């Protein structure tokens, strides 16, 4: 912007000189330079604004996932089971139920990437039904999938990725027995199962394969 101001200042001085000498107007080269600088500045502003928006969305996602996780464990862990969720409709009702109980706000229930409520599934742990839960964040681009997992993955002991659609109960397996295979880039990539090959960002293969496939992606973050 400072360079742009200097150019206009020089142009003003030149115009004053031109008036005295009978010459007027900006050269074509000067016009091209000014327009080029304006284009670069505008592109930079747009890029910075988009990065700021993306950062805010990721922060919101992390806060919402943490709030939901805390609400679920405080409300249901002592009861021994989480409410059964046979499908996405039931999973959506579990989310709405936490809102109606005042455990989370309606804003915390929303997926910040698409504005709809996140689904909460209950699934087995060591073959016992409804002993674990998974919060699904759907409708992600590949870039959003990767950034979300690397941003909030440490908050959860279980992570599963679905490529080409939303997470369903059948994608979750067993919290304790479904081994992770992070080298595949999809499916269960983090688990407490003994044979798990959990996501390791120091493993270049894991980094390259993460969120492999076609968007939209869904990511399930689980705990028990």
From Swiss-Prot:
NCBIfam families: IV_pilin_GFxxxE (TIGR02532)
SUPFAM superfamilies with a match to the protein in the record: Pili subunits (SSF54523)
Gene name, Swiss-Prot/TrEMBL: tcpA
Disulfide linkage: 145-211
Membrane topology category: Single-pass membrane protein
Role: Major component of the toxin co-regulated pilus (tcp) which is a type IV pilus essential for bacterial aggregation and subsequent colonization in the host small intestine.
N-methylmethionine modified-residue sites: 26
UniProt free text on domains: The leader sequence region and some other sequence particularities suggest that TcpA may represent a novel class of pilin, and imply the existence of a novel signal peptidase.
GO cellular component entries: extracellular organelle; membrane; pilus
Primary residence: other
UniProt subcellular location: Fimbrium; Membrane
Organism field: Vibrio cholerae
Residues passing through the membrane, by range: 26-46
Keywords, ordered alphabetically: Disulfide bond, Fimbrium, Membrane, Methylation, Transmembrane, Transmembrane helix
Propeptide: 1-25
Protein name: Toxin coregulated pilin
């Amino acid at each position: 912007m400072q360079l742009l101001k200097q150019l206009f200042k020089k142009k003003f001085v030149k115009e004053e000189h031109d008036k005295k000498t009978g010459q007027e107007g900006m050269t074509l080269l000067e016009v091209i330079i000014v327009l080029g600088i304006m284009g670069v500045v505008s592109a930079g502003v747009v890029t910075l604004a988009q990065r700021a928006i993306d950062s805010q969305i990721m922060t919101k996602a992390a806060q919402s996932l943490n709030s939901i996780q805390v609400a679920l464990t405080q409300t249901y862990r002592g009861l021994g089971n989480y409410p059964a969720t046979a499908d996405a409709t039931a999973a959506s009702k579990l989310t709405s139920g936490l809102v109606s109980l005042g455990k989370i706000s309606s804003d915390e229930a929303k997926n910040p990437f698409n504005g709809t409520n996140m689904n909460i599934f209950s699934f087995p742990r060591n073959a016992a039904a409804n002993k674990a839960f998974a919060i699904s964040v759907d409708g992600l681009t590949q870039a959003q999938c990767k950034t979300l997992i690397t941003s909030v993955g440490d908050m959860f002991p279980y992570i599963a990725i679905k490529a080409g659609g939303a997470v369903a109960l059948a994608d979750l397996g067993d919290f304790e027995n479904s081994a992770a295979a992070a080298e595949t880039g999809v499916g269960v990539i983090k688990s407490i199962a003994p044979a798990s090959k959990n996501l390791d960002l120091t493993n270049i293969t894991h980094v390259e394969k993460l969120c492999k496939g076609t968007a939209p992606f869904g990511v399930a973050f689980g705990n028990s």
